[in-house]
């Protein structure tokens, strides 16, 4: 009798393992997901067991190299164009399945002091960094509501929290992303959808590492932990927020800046 009971337990565990192994993986879409912080997020999600798609709008060769190195599916469109987002999302879902996790990471800068900034510089940043979050989230939202599950994670910035001289366009857009998350979180909560924001500080991306050493040292001197952040540290925040363990967290802002700006 004991042997049979023990055998049943082994069979039951085997069945559970089989079911777990044959479950459909959750699908994650990362905008701007082939470079810098976005690439780290895409790779971390893939390593976490998600099926990942990454969008880009720029260097084809770099994106293809990223895809070849990681096996992550890549798609090219501009998040600033709503119709392109609708068509792109449809293609991703046809290829991979319905999107469960959306990481709005794509962003650009067009820095200028306000007395010199052009409307074009203002509009380009707002269209990508703020309107792009709407353009990507809106076509996915109803599907998440219907399935009663979703994770929307918006990558903002320390400069969306404190502002930055010479970045009135960028700061306004990134601040808008925070407000977007807080408002939409209230609409999604009862449907099992969480909406959160991550505000990175200065991260050791190629762009930051390319600035003159004297400038970089000046930046680091303002960071209490005494170093730049790593893209992988932002990616780990995303992994947590995307997980089932973060289901009680919504409308929140994770500040990851080494203590440079404490809210």
Residue spans for each PLM region:
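Alpha-helical segment proximal to the catalytic Tyr-Lys
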Residues: 142, 186-187, 247
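Active-site helix of classical SDR
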Residues: 137, 173, 181
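Substrate-binding pocket helix/loop in short-chain dehydrogenase/reductase
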Residues: 113-114, 118-126, 208, 219
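Conserved glycine-rich cofactor-binding loop
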Residues: 34-35
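A conserved structural motif in NAD(P)-dependent oxidoreductases
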Residues: 223-234, 245
């Amino acid at each position: 009798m004991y042997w049979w009971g023990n055998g049943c337990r082994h069979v039951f565990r085997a069945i559970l393992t089989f079911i777990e192994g044959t479950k459909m993986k959750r699908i994650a879409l990362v905008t701007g997901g082939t470079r810098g912080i976005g690439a780290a997020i895409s790779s971390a999600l893939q390593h976490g067991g998600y099926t990942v798609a990454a969008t880009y709008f720029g260097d084809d060769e770099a994106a293809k190299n990223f895809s070849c190195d990681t096996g992550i599916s890549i798609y090219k469109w501009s998040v600033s164009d709503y119709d392109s987002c609708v068509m792109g999302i449809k293609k991703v879902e046809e290829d991979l399945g319905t999107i469960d996790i959306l990481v709005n990471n794509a962003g650009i800068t067009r820095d200028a002091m306000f007395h010199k900034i052009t409307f074009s510089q203002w509009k380009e940043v707002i269209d990508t960094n703020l309107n792009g979050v709407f353009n990507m989230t809106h076509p996915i939202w109803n599907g998440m509501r219907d399935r009663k599950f979703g994770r929307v994670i918006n990558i903002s910035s320390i400069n969306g929290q404190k502002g930055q001289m010479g970045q009135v366009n960028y700061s306004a857009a990134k601040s808008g992303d925070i407000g977007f998350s807080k408002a939409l979180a209230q609409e999604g909560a009862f449907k099992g959808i969480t909406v959160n924001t991550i505000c990175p500080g200065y991260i050791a991306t190629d762009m930051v590492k390319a600035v003159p050493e004297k400038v970089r040292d000046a930046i680091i001197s303002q960071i209490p932990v005494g170093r730049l952040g790593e893209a992988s540290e932002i990616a780990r925040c995303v992994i947590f927020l995307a997980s089932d363990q973060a289901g009680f967290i919504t409308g929140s802002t994770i500040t990851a800046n080494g203590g440079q700006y404490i809210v």
